[in-house]
Amino acid sequence: MIAHKQKKAKKKRVWASGQLSAAITTSEMGLKSVSSNSIFDPEYIKELVNDIRKFSHVLLYLKEAILSDCFKEVIHIRLDELLHMSKHQNLNSVDLQNAAETLASKVKAVNFTEVNDENKNDLFREVFSSIETLAFTFGNILTNFLMGDVGNDSILRLPISRESKSFENISMDSVDLPHEKGNFSPIELDNLLLKNSDSIELALSYAKTWSKYTKNIVSWVEKKLNLELESTRNIVKLAEATRSSIGIQEFMPLQSLFTNALLNDIHSSHLLQQTIAALQANKFVQPLLGRKNEMEKQRKEIKELWKQQQNKLLETETALKKAKLLCMQRQDEYEKAKSSMFRAEEEQLSSSVGLGKNLNKLLEKRRRLEEEALQKVEEANEHYKVCVTNVEERRNDLENTKREILTQLRTLVFQCDLTLKAVTVNLFHMQQLQAASLANSLQSLCDSAKLYDPGQEYSEFVKATSSSELEEKVDGNVNKQIASSPQTSGYEPADSLEDVARLPDSCHKLEEDRCSNSADMTGPSFIRSWKFGMFSDSESTGGSSESRSLDSESISPGDFHRKLPRTPSSGTMSSADDLDEREPPSPSEAGPNSLGTFKKTLMSKAALTHKFRKLRSPTKCRDCEGIVMFPGVECEECLLVCHRKCLENLVIVCGHQKLQGKMHIFGAEFIQVAKKEPDGIPFVLKICASEIESRALCLQGIYRVCGNKIKTEKLCQALENGMHLVDISEFSSHDICDVLKLYLRQLPEPFILFRLYKEFIDLAKEIQHVNEEQEAKKDSPEDKKHPHVSIEINRILLRSKDLLRQLPASNFNSLHYLIVHLKRVVDHAEENKMNSKNLGVIFGPTLIRPRPTTAPVTISSLAEYSSQARVVEFLITYAQKIFDGSLQPQAGVIANTGAIAPQVDHGCHPKPLLSPDERDSDHSLKQLFFSSKEDIRTMDCESKTFELTTSFEESERKQNALGKCDAPILDNKVHLLFDQELESASHKTEDTCKSPKLLLLRSDRVANSVQRPTPRTRLRPVSLPVDRLLLLAGSPTERSSRNTGNTDSDKFGKNAAFEGLHRKDNSNTTCSKVNGFDQQNVQKSWDKQNERNSFTAKTTVIIPSAYAEKGLAVSTGNNRGHSSGAAQPSKAHADPARSARDTSEHSSSDSCPVAAVRAPRTLQPQHWTTFYKPPNPTFNVRGTEEKTAFPSAAVPPVLVHAPQSHVAKSDPDLEATLACPVQTSGQPKESSEEPGLPEGTPTCQRPRLKRMQQFEDLEDEIPQFV
């Protein structure tokens, strides 16, 4: 049924379209008659005047409606009356239609809710101007019509409306069908469709057909535009090649004309490309596709809505049918019950008296059944009525929905037609403009070609060749001009016998013609002398010189100096023709960047720093790592090789020296990269971190958002090829972050070594425990009244410092640099949304990970990820307290010859997080975090001296144990006396050693008045491996000696307060070998003297004045204690009940000697306790083991500073005298730490005091402060 109606509608549309075409034809025929005869018809003129007067009145009514504060509907009605003035089709032109559309858009754009007396003139200014424009346009069109100047192009070919009464359609009104006269209004269209039962399906099918139709149109336009675009590109290439070929050929007929034609082709092709781009963008394709997609979307929604409404109506109709059947069934049941009741009554009347009682019961039962049946009938009738009401409501709803859908579809179709009309006008209008410009240019070329006289150029050529008397003069002028021209200086002058001389006037004329006709030619402009017999057959027949090699010499065997000029590449030749290194570059090519023939090649910023030349031999490209054959270039300075096509993406800057080979960085051993840097920090870390800090600290999601994988791999490859010379400014910040994370992730062993993994995981658990305690206590009023840094946090800080000092110098410096960089990222967390917790999650598994194994992943190993993140978060949060802004130098930087390693580039060091003033203002808080391993380090190994220092450790510990009340007074006196002696001694050391001046680490002069805790001199037991027990049993200096070598001297200060505070352990440290002086010989002599000279508890040291005159500075202090002054040997296993927390607290409070100078060394435990095998002693070791022991408490502290030259020449008696006093109790022999191990030969062994245990117990009762 639907298909049949669609066929009928199609037949009607075909018939209507044929009638419309006939109407248009009749209209076109009538226009001529109107233009010729209607003007002289008095009746038509009278009617026209009346219509014009009515049009002016409508304009006035519209203006008055706007000025008289009418409602919006009134203004729109007036505007609608104005726009429907379409009676005279001869006056309905494009300009008038555009003016009317402009007026309508201006009126609709006014927001009438905001109109008042104040802003009325401003809001309606554009409307009034549009009304005046419409009136002016109408007047012009009317004048042209009356004057007979109306053109057919300006008249719109619109369908003739019912109101259009003119001579060409009067006869047609009598034959048109009633329902086909003119255009229907939108309401009439909807009413017509409502009469049809299948109106929704017809409208939806039309919308679907419109979508398919539009799809085909868009497909045709897109394919056509693509073909035209490809054609224009080929035309441009062909025109460029042809123009460059015919441009060098002179005296050719119509040469300028064809050159202009080629230029016109190029210009028109460029215009066509712009037109195609516009049509593909917002002029045709995109708007039409958008409208089609919207049509499809709304059509599907409308279809779904219509199906839902139909299903609802079907459900209600089904319910109505069921209700009707139920009513009929109930009625039948009621009739049966009623007849049964009637029979029962009859039986009762005819029955005897004895059966009356039973019949009464039966009668009552049947009466009850009859009533129930009647009740069911009434209920069924009520349900039926409800169903009937529901069906009526559904039908009304369906009718309303049908009307709304038809209105929506009609509006949608109108909008789609409007869009299709607009884009179609754009399409043909732009094509018309393109064709018009092309037609004009072709017409001008045709006119120019008609003016050419055949043989004109040949005559000019003959005249030029026959003027032999002026050959030398012209040849000299030409050669002079060639030599002076900067664009042709690369070409040698031709021989005079082969040159074709021309007259000066013809020369100038030719030069002017070439400049005017070939102004846009690419390549050098030059004056070329003709040579006879120099054309090959292929050139003369083919018409192009591209088939020959433009780099080759002349074809003539006798012409060794002439070279053909090189034409630029047209896209079809090899790109190697521009790389002729046999020709010296011209002055114009030898610019500041020395681009030469690469001016047309796209280059990156890094590529512009190179000075390229043609590649001499095949090799590998540094950019893409492909094989470079002939189309390759090579830098003259750094010898970088790459393809020409890779110059656009090159990121390696010229280093003006030979570029190093490729270095495998990602996945390589860390020490391989670190040993090539002065400070041990990989250049990848420094480059990436500095670039991120310069432009991406406020970038949201830094280090969290992933970058482009291809660009990241490109940057990794460039860093391996160019190392420090890579310019990473062209890459995005996320790509740089990915490179940094990838480098850290691919390290075989992270910055925090595998052997320290367990300690850091335990540290993370302590951090978690402390955080939980702080969370529980942060709301208590006591903490709010007395805010202070938790002692547990301070202890964790000191333990973390102790663990970090066990890292090698390069690992420590790299970790230091990275953590400080991440701290700066966290400082901008408000902008980048990356706090320390987020960064800990990202960098935790990268910086701290266990040794890889083949064991399967367990839940415990997964749970350690949070611990890894927590440690990194803690390091970032307390970076100011853990790292102090300076880096450790690498170990082993001094060679056997005493040469000093290159200085560390301080520009690469992390910037200090606080200024000195801020440090001083915050000094009261940071005093709690001083650690001997952090604040006291050795000086540079290139110093020419060593210092032998002692301390008041035993006396201070005795004072703290005997009386806490006298501790501050004694401490102040001892420190004041000792500081004065140290200052005088250190000044002498400066003069002797000529070492760099030491800077102040802190400048707090009131530190002497603060009571300082006494550090322990013994170790508490802890559950660690044997080698770690040996490491912890030694002094802090001994534990960290392998990590510290020559350190930047700017880190240390001479503040007397802190020197007195930290001088509690003294040790003898020397460089292994400086200026040929071997420290091991002195150590052996000291050991021998130690064996012979064993001092008791009351031994004193007497140094003659003769030795002081030789350069020894002696400072003697008074010892105030005698009862328990003996040194206490270290007992690693003395008290197994002590906890690991006390152990870490004790080890963190150990101290080191101040400014002790020695070479870095490696701790070598006894070989029978571990698997470690001690290496053979060489002169390259960082230092020898120090075997020190403390004398009795009665010995006054002695500070000796002696130059190496004096020590080397000192007497044996002096060595014997200095042997034992310089040994400290804080550094006992390793063999004495393990009671169960074989004992070596001890040096200056002392008996254990009887009251040792008492002092230890008393010391435990004294509160310890960090």
Curated annotation (Swiss-Prot):
Residue span of region Interaction with PTPN13/PTPL1: 1263-1266
BP GO terms, sorted: negative regulation of small GTPase mediated signal transduction; signal transduction
Alphabetized Gene3D superfamilies for the sequence: 3.30.60.20, Arfaptin homology (AH) domain/BAR domain, Rho GTPase activation protein
UniProt site positions, description: Arginine finger: 704
Bias (Basic and acidic residues) ranges: 1132-1148
Location of the Rho-GAP domain: 668-883
Biased composition (Low complexity): 538-556
Phosphoserine found at: 166, 171, 174, 185, 496, 516, 549, 915, 951, 1023, 1149, 1151
Zinc finger regions, Phorbol-ester/DAG-type: 609-654
Residue ranges of every copy of the F-BAR domain listed in the record: 187-457
GO cellular component terms, semicolon-separated: cytoplasm; protein-containing complex
Coiled coil: 291-413
Biased composition range(s): Polar residues: 1115-1127
Superkingdom per UniProt: Eukaryota
GO molecular function: GTPase activator activity; PDZ domain binding; zinc ion binding
Keyword field: Coiled coil, GTPase activation, Metal-binding, Phosphoprotein, Zinc, Zinc-finger
Residue span of region Disordered: 538-596, 1033-1054, 1114-1153, 1222-1248
Function per UniProt: GTPase activator for the Rho-type GTPases by converting them to an inactive GDP-bound state. Has strong activity toward RHOA, and weaker activity toward RAC1 and CDC42. May act as a specific effector of RAP2A to regulate Rho. In concert with RASIP1, suppresses RhoA signaling and dampens ROCK and MYH9 activities in endothelial cells and plays an essential role in blood vessel tubulogenesis.
Oligomeric and partner information: Interacts with PTPN13/PTPL1. Interacts with RAP2A via its coiled coil domain. Interacts with RASIP1.
Name of the protein in question: Rho GTPase-activating protein 29
Organism: Rattus norvegicus (Rat)
